[in-house]
Amino acid sequence: MASSLMSNAATTMAAATTTAQANMVAPFNGLKSISAFPVTRKNNDITSVASNGGRVQCMVWPPLGMKKFETLSYLPPLSEESLLKEVQYLLNNGWVPCLEFEPTHGFVYREHGNTPGYYDGRYWTMWKLPMFGCTDPSQVVAELEEAKKAYPEAFIRIIGFDNVRQVQCVSFIAYKPASYGA
């Protein structure tokens, strides 16, 4: 009997505690003052965004005699080892290597007016056929050497073509003529 009295007392006390907790809600004191929140001020000064240890300097690329075009054209001429690595990248992605050359204009140019057009030097002549089934980068470099001998004054580029999606995925200049000078 003593145990049943204790359990009844414990049950009554637990019920009273949960009822009291359910009825306790913090009173609404109104909106908080904005001065209670930390404020960060935005600085509209451009020099605070970029820092090179002092003042910000900009470089202007000389526009005359230093035309740049295509991917990798800002780099020095690629060595044979670098070319082999680039072609291996194409092959690893499942793209078909293809060579194109342009004997007169290596740049986009306006041939038929001063507004952009469809044939503004974007289309080059294909060297032979795309190299479907090629698995060795040295085959592509050998074709590049053959194209250089046939057209020593032409720009030659290597293209990675995705024959499933029917798109050109990558293109870079592999050879610039000696007369170009840069």
From Swiss-Prot:
Family: Belongs to the RuBisCO small chain family.
Location, primary (coarse class): plastid
Assembly: Heterohexadecamer of 8 large and 8 small subunits.
Induction line: No expression of this mRNA was seen in leaves.
Function, as annotated: RuBisCO catalyzes two reactions: the carboxylation of D-ribulose 1,5-bisphosphate, the primary event in carbon dioxide fixation, as well as the oxidative fragmentation of the pentose substrate. Both reactions occur simultaneously and in competition at the same active site. Although the small subunit is not catalytic it is essential for maximal activity.
Keywords carried by this UniProt record: Calvin cycle, Carbon dioxide fixation, Chloroplast, Photorespiration, Photosynthesis, Plastid, Transit peptide
Name assigned to this protein: Ribulose bisphosphate carboxylase small subunit, chloroplastic 5
Highest classification ranks of the organism: Eukaryota, Viridiplantae, Streptophyta, Embryophyta, Tracheophyta
Biological process according to GO: photorespiration; reductive pentose-phosphate cycle
Note: The basic functional RuBisCO is composed of a large chain homodimer in a 'head-to-tail' conformation. In form I RuBisCO this homodimer is arranged in a barrel-like tetramer with the small subunits forming a tetrameric 'cap' on each end of the 'barrel'.
Residue ranges crossing the lipid bilayer per the database entry: none
Compartment(s) of residence: Plastid, Chloroplast
Pfam families xrefs: RbcS, RuBisCO_small
InterPro entries, per the entry: RuBisCO_ssu, RuBisCO_ssu_dom, RuBisCO_ssu_N, RuBisCO_ssu_sf
Keyword Cell inner membrane belongs to the record: no
Gene Ontology terms, MF aspect: ribulose-bisphosphate carboxylase activity
Transit peptide: 1-49
CC terms in the record's Gene Ontology section: chloroplast
Superkingdom field: Eukaryota
